[in-house]
From Swiss-Prot:
Protein name according to UniProt: NADH-ubiquinone oxidoreductase chain 2
Pfam families tied to this protein: NADH_dehy_S2_C (PF06444), Proton_antipo_M (PF00361)
Membrane topology: Multi-pass membrane protein
Species, as recorded: Bos taurus
Modified residues (N-formylmethionine): 1
The keyword Electron transport is annotated on this UniProt entry: yes
Subcellular location: Mitochondrion inner membrane
Subunit: Core subunit of respiratory chain NADH dehydrogenase (Complex I) which is composed of 45 different subunits. Interacts with TMEM242.
Amino acid sequence: MNPIIFIIILLTIMLGTIIVMISSHWLLVWIGFEMNMLAIIPIMMKNHNPRATEASTKYFLTQSTASMLLMMAVIINLMFSGQWTVMKLFNPMASMLMTMALAMKLGMAPFHFWVPEVTQGIPLSSGLILLTWQKLAPMSVLYQIFPSINLNLILTLSVLSILIGGWGGLNQTQLRKIMAYSSIAHMGWMTAVLPYNPTMTLLNLIIYIIMTSTMFTMFMANSTTTTLSLSHTWNKTPIMTVLILATLLSMGGLPPLSGFMPKWMIIQEMTKNNSIILPTFMAITALLNLYFYMRLTYSTTLTMFPSTNNMKMKWQFPLMKKMTFLPTMVVLSTMMLPLTPMLSVLE
């Protein structure tokens, strides 16, 4: 792809998200979502192969359906209130449709089926944009309309997402699919605390984006896409392999790493609001995610990974790609837990 065209497309994606985040008019929000969706499709199809085409088509169809639901919710709201203002939804039907549309855009269960398939079919760099930047716009709208969201609906969606994000990743060997299921589970954690403390949702989103960006950057540096190729990285880049494993465990929420902080704070916030059964269930279900991250870590630490094919050993070469921000990202992904007392201002 021509570098100038690529930069224009990236700027369009950024502009689309910014329009959604700063708009107070529903029509502008919808336009921002459409810009965002149409701009990322050429990036997904950077590699011309059937898998990328299929993934882009699936993404286009699901996002179009979500945009249609969003517009339907806006029109119903307009009929009852006569207003285009983003902040408040005056009708329960409009609120329900809007929540479902945003859940579909975020890839939350039960609208999650497109996320693993699309992530698996596109390059790692496109997967990084899809699982990080593309979450900002829908999450910002959810943050703005949270007072009028149906509590039971959003909690049902979040619990389903945490459960399916854990179960779905158990049987995977493809790292992109594992990251996709991890994304579904993280979206569940974010939306579970949204009705109680929306600022906590933003904190969780920031930490999730940092950890996912770090993981994808290291996968791209090593061209790692499967459990098998991950198990051979120790011979190629031993230091980076250790960092990958630490970040994986952080994503699983293992103390004393950064990923434990949002889970701890969310459970604390929900128990303060007299919700006991739900956080208990969420904490138990989080062990599913931790299990498949631990399994990846274990398989990588084996001296010889059990594989049927005769795979050549990787050789240590100096990395040609410049990794300027990687040390900072790894530190943020693994060592933020001591900052937790400073975040008491969120309450």
